[in-house]
Design a protein with these regions (language model features):
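N-terminal Rossmann-like dinucleotide-binding module
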Residues: 1-37
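Local beta-strand N-terminus motif with an aromatic residue
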Residues: 26, 43-46, 116
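A contiguous active-site-proximal alpha/beta segment in oxidoreductase catalytic domains
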Residues: 76-116
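Short, well-ordered alpha-helical microsegments
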Residues: 13, 55-56, 107-108
Length: 116
């Protein structure tokens, strides 16, 4: 069972949740809590579907905890911050995925093959 945390439950977060709920090997370990930090340690990987301006800080926090991350686009507003996040992912030996298009389609999602 792959324990999954979802940060952000707006329009896109709901689409991701609904699509990913169809994967039988996946279990959501989050709640509608205002503080996502409450469940970070319970998750194997984190999906981030928050407003764009929050991506950098939340992704960085998750990577520093050794979590695999799937972030909605854009990852960051600039190359410097994006490079920093990928360097952290490399240092902690975790995966950092960034959504491009149609990430709510279950056939195109990396977790389907446990490729994280």
């Amino acid at each position: 069972m792959i324990r999954t945390g979802l940060i952000g439950y707006g329009q896109w977060g709901k689409k991701l949740h609904n699509s990913l709920s169809k994967i039988t090997d996946l279990q959501f370990v989050c709640s509608s809590s205002d503080d996502y930090r409450e469940y970070l340690n319970k998750a194997d990987w984190i999906i981030i579907a928050t407003p764009n301006k929050t991506h950098y800080s939340i992704v960085k926090e998750c990577l520093l905890l050794g979590k695999n991350v799937f972030c909605e686009k854009p990852l960051t507003p600039n190359l410097k911050e994006a490079s920093e996040l990928y360097s952290i992912a490399d240092k902690y030996c975790v995966k950092l995925y960034v959504s491009d298009i149609q990430n709510f389609r279950i056939n195109e999602f990396p977790i389907k093959e446990k490729n994280f």
